[in-house]
Amino acid sequence: MDVPRPAFKCFDDDGRLKRSGTVWTASAHIITAVIGSGVLSLAWAIGQLGWIAGPTVMLLFSFVTYYSSTLLSDCYRTGDPVSGKRNYTYMDAVRSILGGFRFKICGLIQYLNLFGITVGYTIAASISMMAIKRSNCFHESGGKNPCHMSSNPYMIMFGVTEILLSQIKDFDQIWWLSIVAAIMSFTYSAIGLALGIIQVAANGVVKGSLTGISIGAVTQTQKIWRTFQALGDIAFAYSYSVVLIEIQDTVRSPPAESKTMKIATRISIAVTTTFYMLCGCMGYAAFGDKAPGNLLTGFGFYNPFWLLDVANAAIVIHLVGAYQVFAQPIFAFIEKQAAARFPDSDLVTKEYEIRIPGFRSPYKVNVFRAVYRSGFVVLTTVISMLMPFFNDVVGILGALGFWPLTVYFPVEMYIRQRKVERWSMKWVCLQMLSCGCLMITLVAGVGSIAGVMLDLKVYKPFKTTY
């Protein structure tokens, strides 16, 4: 039976409904994916590097991220860039172009990165909850009570919330979640920027130095470690490559998806870099050598304290949902592996229906899912309580994800996809870029781990108060 020609207009070449994304929707998705809690540590990062190296390094990272993103956009289709087989995710592209072994390595790095991000988000959320409590306590006491408190109860509160949310299957697919995340991230970032500008105006002077935090405020060794760690913090702020292919999969064609995506990447990187520059530089200008690891906590108990409360509440709301966005892929992977290995186990595969008053459909409970997901959240919470160092964790995450996910795999896929000849000028330049970024990742990782070790010397697990 012949299918009427107009019917084809509803579907793309892979049989899926026709994609409708444009340059502007793709740009919006990228900006939403990039701007997040990483913006909070940029003032500290610039503070370690100074007025010359800080903005220069940020521009360098933005260029590398943009260039590697253009390489990755050419890998959306395997083979022919216009009519080749589509890759729906970053992992699909790695498996299709580079093959099984590197696919497994990429998966391991990606899941480690996701796990680390859930730990970082637990720490960041607890800091913001504690900041709200301390702010109100300080003002209620008229400034007489320093309101020292432990972050542990707030981490536990966050953990309990995540245990409940983690039982909702495919929570990360809820349509309004990304909208709420975008609104919240722009809210706290904009408030941080505005308060930085206000603080600079109140100081009447731009603080900071050309070379960053001065020797004396820290030792020579600490200066080196902090400089390295700052690279990791900036790298974390630009970590979005793993979602680029998925964003590209929403773009319509013609023109070719890669062409649209390159324009969208250029727009979004320009916008986010400008925003990052403003937030980081204004934070450093406001606090100088005392620029805090988390920008919003640096404003302490300044008025308007209610505005800081709004910003910190926005962080908590954002991170409650963002935790699930990063945890759910790990849940799905582990549960898929368990089902494949134990297909006949009721513990793994059987679902029990529970009727909940007020809901039409029964809630389906799987014993393995309930226990495993709860255990995962407990583990991330305990690790956060053992190492509640936001800056150090962000630096480690930036180091872990930047070179392999943002540079190495896109470069290798592009070389394979475009059949770039070994030892040609282009091949050599791409390998030099990859090696240079590997060095940055290594020193950032070393600096961040050194930061953790230094913090652990004075930190008593489960006992330290702020």
UniProtKB/Swiss-Prot annotation:
Residue intervals annotated with topology Cytoplasmic: 1-22, 65-111, 199-226, 288-290, 335-369, 414-435
Q: How is its activity regulated?
A: Inhibited by 2,4-dinitrophenol.
* GO BP field: amino acid transport
| Subcellular location as annotated | Cell membrane
Tissue specificity, per the record, is: Expressed in leaves, stems and flowers.
Database matches in Pfam families: Aa_trans
Q: What does the record give as the function of this protein?
A: Amino acid-proton symporter. Stereospecific transporter with a broad specificity for neutral amino acids, favoring small amino acids such as alanine, asparagine and glutamine. Also accepts large aromatic residues such as in phenlalanine or tyrosine.
State what protein this is by name: Amino acid permease 4
| Organism placement in taxonomy | Eukaryota, Viridiplantae, Streptophyta, Embryophyta, Tracheophyta
Gene encoding the protein: AAP4
